Amino acid sequence: MGVFTNLFQDEIDFIEKKYKIKILEIKNIDNGILNSNFYIKTKNKKYILRIYEANRTIDEEKQELILLDRIVDFIPVSIAIKNIDNEYISIFNNKKFALFEYIDGNSITKIDTHIIREIAIYLGKLHSFTKDISFEKYNRKTRIDLDFYYNEIKKSEIDFKFKNELLNSADKINGFDFSILPSGVIHGDIFPDNVLLDDYNNIKVIFDFNESYYAPFIFDIAIVINFWIKINGFDFFTENNLIRDFLNYYSKYRKITKEELKSLDIACKKMALTFIFLRIYKEKIDNSYQKAISIQEKSYLDLIKLIKNK
């Protein structure tokens, strides 16, 4: 999330009018590096206000919000609230706004078998549903794009730790064709940060589908394996048990193919590099942390362990 764009009083007035609410409190939400988000409190309810920062069309942004409405009955998600014009997105001062239900919950502080099985089930349900959605129906762009970040970093003159090693690693996986694998709409950013738990440590909400796009399912699978399991430095036995459990419970809802299993290691490396390069780009080239009004900084160095000794 994070905040890159100021919210001015005339825009607050516009939001109040468009959604028939009276805002009592607004706070910046610091975590994340792709959109501007605000916590909003009214007398009776709480909301999340998103200001879109991506260079996407209104129709592309609507695709995400329509998807949330379609999956809310079997996946716990926060849906967008339509304005008085029955539209998901409101436009004012050349800014695009969306208002979401606020769902209170607890951040994930510990990864265990129960959590891994739950995210596996929900991800399997999501992919089982979206396998029937074509690229033509969900043709929105994503900013989680290894090729873009690789090219921007390679042509720049910036230097940083592990630069040559990272670029060489990307070169090695560049020739693999993931498009031959089963595809549909994926979450694209399914990190523990985008999940909240209830008081019994069950998943209460999965949010931030704003980078969802049509892609091979193996990318979401690799993100979970990397950023829910491998990043935590479990011992060999625990790590492999968690990965096995994740794949088994996922397969109860969408069976993973042999071809996907064969490509799993290279997919994990690709997704690790994707988010490493995203962070490098945001920090070193785009200067997002300097430009942000309010943001929680995240270093690419925290992710290097995912590609070392592979």
Predicted feature residues:
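An alpha-helical support segment within catalytic cores of ATP-dependent transferases
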Residues: 8-18, 135, 147-188, 198, ...
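ATP-binding pocket architecture of kinase catalytic cores
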Residues: 42-133
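Active-site acidic catalytic loop and adjacent metal/ATP-binding pocket
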Residues: 33-41, 48-49, 80, 173-219
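ATP/Mg2+ or Mg2+-diphosphate-binding catalytic cores
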Residues: 275-310
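Active-site activation/catalytic loop segments of kinase-like enzymes and analogous catalytic loops
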Residues: 218-254, 270-287
